[in-house]
């Protein structure tokens, strides 16, 4: 089978590997779609922590069942999506129902080889039947689930003022589910094309260009009260620190992105506003189900997918996805 390796930062290669045998208790999946996310781009550019090379990237996956264990609810040919967070099931986080925070987590495409392959054998508890979804929709489920989980953490309610800082794919995923919860969503970002997409396709009520006077605009939108819930999806420590100033009294600040460095905030302001600070990590099976329900109902625009390539084209075309001028939102790799 064909597999794409990131050998070193900036260097991809195609290799022929034996088709894997189905492991005990596992499902052999014929991979059909691989969504490209920021993690893959960071691996390619050499900016992903906790990673060793060479590595097969890819964790936003869909495919069809090639072979399932006896007694499985899955059958040959079923369209499936894959939860890429391989959790242990017995640590304190898993036992509390927070498999997304497993102490022994192994993420496909990061800690172990991922899905830029033709076939992958995956423990059956991480393979979800994507009934009623297209292969594209099923491959979008993972990144959308990160947004759905963040919105659940922030407990967005009807008519709340919601600010999302960062209009990349994860920020857009947050926007989708904040709008579905009834939030009045404002997006702030430096890229006009992405802000326009958020307003045109995702239901954002307001968009603000990052730069001089942006805080005044945010104040005007909320009549000076600022926001009930603020989400950071930038992965930038300075932006994360600045985000505290956008939270209204009694509001919540949800950090969806993660950085390796420390961040700081003004403690008197934090206490004066009685701010709630939350982290949001990965997603749980419940979030995946929530996303698939929304996809089946036609509530998520497939226009999020802007670029496509075949698996065999990845070594030659992948670098183009890193160019801001290309207007990439979500790249999708197709496996014949």
What positions do the PLM features span?
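NAD(P)H dinucleotide-binding glycine-rich loop of Rossmann-like/cofactor-binding domains
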Residues: 88-165
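Glycine-rich beta-strand-centered segment in the early N-terminal region that forms part
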Residues: 18-34, 47-92, 131-133
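Short amphipathic alpha-helix with an adjacent loop that forms part of the alpha/beta core around
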Residues: 213-224
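Mid-domain Rossmann-like dinucleotide-binding core that forms the NAD(H)/NADP(H) cofactor-binding site
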Residues: 133-212
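Short, well-ordered loop/turn sites that connect or cap secondary structure elements
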Residues: 74-75, 156, 247
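C-terminal hydrophobic helical "lid"/dimerization subdomain
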Residues: 1, 241, 285, 289-336
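Residue-level marker of beta-strand positions
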Residues: 60, 78-79, 93, 119, ...
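Glycine-rich phosphate-binding loop and adjacent beta-alpha segment
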Residues: 237-297, 334-336
């Amino acid at each position: 089978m064909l597999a794409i390796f990131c050998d070193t930062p900036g260097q991809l290669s195609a290799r022929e590997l034996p088709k894997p045998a189905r492991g005990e208790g596992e499902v052999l999946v014929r991979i059909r779609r691989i969504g490209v996310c920021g993690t893959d781009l960071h691996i390619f550019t050499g900016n992903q922590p906790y990673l060793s090379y060479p590595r097969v990237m890819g964790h936003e996956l869909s495919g069809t069942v090639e072979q399932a264990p006896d007694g499985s609810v899955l059958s040959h040919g079923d369209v499936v999506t894959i939860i890429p967070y391989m959790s242990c099931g017995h640590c304190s986080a898993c036992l509390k129902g927070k498999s997304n925070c497993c102490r022994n987590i192994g993420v496909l495409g990061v800690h172990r080889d991922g899905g830029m392959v033709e076939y992958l054998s995956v423990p059956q508890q991480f393979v979800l039947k994507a009934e009623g979804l297209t292969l594209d929709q099923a491959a979008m489920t993972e990144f959308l689930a990160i947004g759905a989980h963040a919105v659940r953490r922030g407990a967005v309610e009807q008519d709340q003022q919601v600010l999302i800082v960062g209009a990349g794919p994860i920020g857009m995923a947050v926007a989708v589910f904040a709008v579905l919860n009834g939030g009045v969503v404002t997006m702030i970002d430096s890229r006009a094309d992405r802000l326009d997409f958020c307003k045109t396709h995702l239901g954002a009520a307001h968009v603000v260009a990052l730069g001089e006077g942006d805080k005044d605009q945010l104040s005007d939108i909320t009549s000076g009260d600022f926001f009930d819930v603020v989400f950071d999806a930038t992965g930038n420590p300075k932006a994360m620190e600045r985000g505290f100033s956008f939270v209204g009294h009694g509001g919540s600040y949800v950090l969806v992105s993660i950085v390796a460095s420390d961040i700081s905030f003004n403690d008197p302001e934090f206490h004066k506003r009685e701010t709630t600070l939350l982290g949001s990590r990965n997603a749980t099976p419940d979030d995946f189900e929530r996303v698939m329900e929304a996809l089946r109902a036609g509530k998520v625009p497939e226009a999020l997918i802007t670029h496509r390539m075949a698996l065999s084209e990845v070594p030659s075309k992948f670098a183009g996805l890193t160019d801001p001028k290309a207007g990439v939102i979500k790249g999708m790799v197709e496996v014949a």
